[in-house]
Amino acid sequence: MKSYRKELWFNVPGRRAFINITPRVQECLRESGIENGLALVNAMHITASVFINDDERGLHQDYEDWLEELAPHEPISHYRHNRTGEDNGDAHLKRQVMGREVVVAITDGRLDFGPWEQIFYGEFDGGRRKRVLVKIIGE
């Protein structure tokens, strides 16, 4: 069995963003030479997420609206976490809802997606470098 590991780095200038990282994960798969196995893609920060969904602008805005309704950024004083001097209590909750990682089957050298599925990096507290781990195992 072969194993491949790579870190993808992001530095989102704004507070939040959804970035389609499917092409970068596909490039990792090509580099790995693995034809059949599993790809784990996970955010290595507690205010960022990796998830699978459709790459449709309206859906991204729906996520933004829904997450802000669930855990609004302001008032910052609303979050106990922010009493430590932070201002990102909402980002931790948003990440928890959106998830940490995805696992995608690899079949015949391709990510084995359903219709419309794409891999996204979700940033909820931007402004600094963060990384996503891609770990691929298989034959």
Describe each model-derived feature in a short phrase:
Residues 1-139:
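Active-site histidine-anchored catalytic micro-motif
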